[in-house]
């Protein structure tokens, strides 16, 4: 599998956890898998396939996931019908369920183009940086900075 998103984080139960979402199989098919790996000292590693629990999740490739404000947040990606995503997805339950949040305060600026494989990082002041990515026609070199739940997104390289 290629073009998947991966994130390691501390779960709400304060245990190490990793999440692997989506991707593309060797024949080019996008998948909707969401693997969750959690470590518990008494049991070792446990793995769960959330796509069995919630199969309605769209197949996606080329997304990026961060942990922010107690939830997981997904940016970008392409579905199996080659539809590019520009919306932001939230998960309040560590990757089991995903939804589009209130788009009044949780959307990227009009100048942001849909893309796959962006790099997304959070700094110590809780600024989110969405950096670059790819489209069918090439690569992006733009950088956007903002906060979730606020209309303060800005392109940094205009």
Where do the protein language model's features map onto the residues?
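Kelch-like beta-propeller repeat domains
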Residues: 1-158
């Amino acid at each position: 599998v290629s073009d998947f998103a991966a994130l390691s984080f501390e779960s709400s139960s304060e245990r190490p956890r990793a999440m692997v979402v989506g991707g593309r199989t060797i024949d080019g098919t996008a998948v909707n898998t969401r693997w969750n790996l959690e470590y518990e000292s008494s049991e070792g590693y446990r793995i769960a396939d959330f796509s069995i629990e919630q199969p309605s999740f769209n197949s996606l490739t080329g997304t990026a996931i961060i942990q922010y404000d107690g939830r997981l947040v997904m940016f970008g990606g392409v579905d199996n019908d080659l539809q590019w995503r520009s919306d932001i997805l939230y998960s309040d339950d560590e990757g089991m369920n995903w939804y589009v949040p209130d788009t009044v305060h949780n959307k990227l600026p009009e100048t942001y183009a849909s893309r796959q494989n962006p790099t997304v990082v959070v700094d110590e002041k809780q600024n989110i940086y969405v950096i670059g990515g790819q489209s069918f026609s090439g690569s992006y070199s733009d950088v956007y900075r903002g906060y979730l739940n606020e209309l303060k997104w800005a392109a940094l390289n205009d």
